[in-house]
């Protein structure tokens, strides 16, 4: 690996690590929402989750990050099993999936997940599926869009 390639690889890894830290914070907010969020806190948590999901998505679809990954992928053969080549292939595969999703969909999925979780808890406690049905249908609609 040339010095320039090593430098680019380190930049890509640094970018991916920071993105992973942001994703773990997002997951922590999700855990907290499912276990500790007080009633009435869902709207604010949905805003937090939506903002963070959008920021994470922006990092994944960042043009410079994509160009660096493409360059690194072009430098390594498909059968290269070095740690660096495997990392690049996995990051590129993850990025390729994410660039297909519009940011608005990513944000709406995040928001709907939070609101749906809270609606489900209330519906379960009140034995009233209708309280949850609208958000469940919206979630399914968004997941279908994501799958397309």
PLM segments and residue spans:
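A well-structured
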Residues: 2-148
């Amino acid at each position: 690996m040339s010095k320039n390639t090593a430098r680019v690889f380190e930049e890509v890894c640094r970018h991916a690590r920071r993105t992973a830290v942001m994703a773990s914070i997002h997951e922590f907010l999700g855990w907290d929402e499912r276990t500790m969020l007080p009633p009435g806190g869902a709207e604010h948590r949905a805003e937090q989750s939506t903002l963070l999901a959008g920021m994470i998505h922006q990092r994944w679809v960042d043009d410079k990050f994509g160009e660096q990954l493409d360059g690194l992928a072009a430098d390594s053969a498909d059968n290269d099993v070095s740690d660096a080549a495997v990392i690049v292939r996995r990051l590129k595969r993850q990025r390729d999936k994410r660039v297909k999703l519009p940011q608005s969909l990513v944000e709406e999925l995040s928001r709907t997940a939070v609101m749906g979780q809270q609606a489900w808890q209330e519906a379960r406690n009140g034995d009233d599926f209708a309280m949850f049905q609208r958000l469940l249908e919206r979630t399914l609609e968004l997941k279908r869009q994501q799958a397309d």
